[in-house]
Amino acid sequence: FVDKYKDLNPDSQIILIDKESCPNYIPNGINQLFRGDIQDLSDAMWGRACLAAQIESNHRFIQAEVLAIEAPSNTLLLKDSQGRVFEEGYETLVCAMGASPQSHYIETSQTNKVLVTKYYEESQASLKLIEASQEVLVIGAGLIGLDLAYSLSLQGKRVKLIEAAERPDFYQTDAELIAPVMAEMSTHHVTFINNKRVTAIHEIEGKVVAHTEQGDTFQGDLAILAINFRPNTHLLQGQVACALDKTILVNENLQTSQANIYAIGDMVSLHFGILGMDYYTPLINQAMKTGQALALHLAGYPIPPLQTVKVLGSSHFGYYRASVGVTEEEAELYMDTCSYLYQNGDSKNLFWLKLIARKTDGILIGAQLLSKTNALVIANQLGQALALKVTDADLAFQDFLFLQGHSDLAYHLHEACLKLFEKRLRHED
């Protein structure tokens, strides 16, 4: 938001408030460090060095914790790192407090060995502890947990990846698309433990012990929480209208029930047209597009209605993976579906693409990718297809680039859509 609004209104006055010294830190930059993509955590910044050192003269950065939002008086109550409490007024307030890994069912004791790695200071403190450890418990095997487990394995750590569901990335990936990843885990010193819901984590004699609902215990030097992220909206509770899941209710312009307060990013849900409901997706792309959209709106530009199709991607255990829309397992709770798993290549250049369509009319509602080479760009095209309610026939019979040996992805997508179209019509007949 800040970057876009400054571009549109260079003479505006913006006050950026954050308790973090580097609010532009890319979440979980530890992954980049452990994979050798960067040399230092300070390199894991969005677009530039630490934002606090880059504020222009007509803008202000206040490193402080917001203790309270007093909407009736347009005032914030702040506390800085020295413990000084003071007030700051505002005309327009943009709330972008993000989300944190929160659990209502995991009890943790007072220990510095239960880690989270979303923010810069947290990651710095966690890095020292991780480097001194040998065995790490990762709680949660979604995309964040899988990425962390893989990155830790590259540093020679033994990892226990503990998941409440039957398989990793249960909510984003159907079983057949995650099976090759699971097979690869054991070769990276990662032990996957499924169907075990962690209810408590305690430090006992210098070790962390995770207790599960099923009565099991698992021990390690450290535990890292990679569980569901929930919005940091506690300061707005009672100030503006909120949904039952504690996200902030906003209109089409991201305006809350208080006319001069807006909410963006992980604070809000967006409309998920595939299922016809609002859906919470705490993703970086949501933070970017809602922030940019709000900047344009406040600068006087009309913005289109925002929606989500849940585009996710990752790379771990030798595979590139992406998921768009809903899984077949989730979709079947709401509608009849037809799916096709397109498979090409051998184990060295494997390319799998699963397409899921509504059986009645062929409208695409989900897609999943698994490949040995970086084919993640195809997720963007599929995301656009889902947003526009494109059918399997539309994609199968549209023009596509064909240049032998140089446009394989376009051909694979064409073939996958054609196969899905054929299969769905055979079923209808």
Task: Kindly give the residue locations of the regions a language model identified.
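A conserved short coil-to-beta-strand element within the FAD-binding core of flavoproteins
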Residues: 63-74, 194-206
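Beta1-alpha1 glycine-rich phosphate/pyrophosphate-binding loop at the start
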Residues: 1-59, 151-173
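Rossmann-like dinucleotide-binding cores of NAD(P)H-dependent redox enzymes
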Residues: 145-200, 285-286, 303-325
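Glycine-rich dinucleotide-binding loop and its adjacent helix/turn
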Residues: 92-155, 191, 244-245, 250-252
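Cysteine/selenocysteine-centered motifs that mediate thiol-based redox chemistry or coordinate metal-sulfur cofactors
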Residues: 388-429
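Mid-to-C-terminal Rossmann-like scaffold of FAD/NAD(P)H-dependent oxidoreductases
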Residues: 270-373, 418-429
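Core beta-strand elements of the Rossmann-like FAD/NAD(P) dinucleotide-binding domain
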Residues: 83-92, 213-222, 257
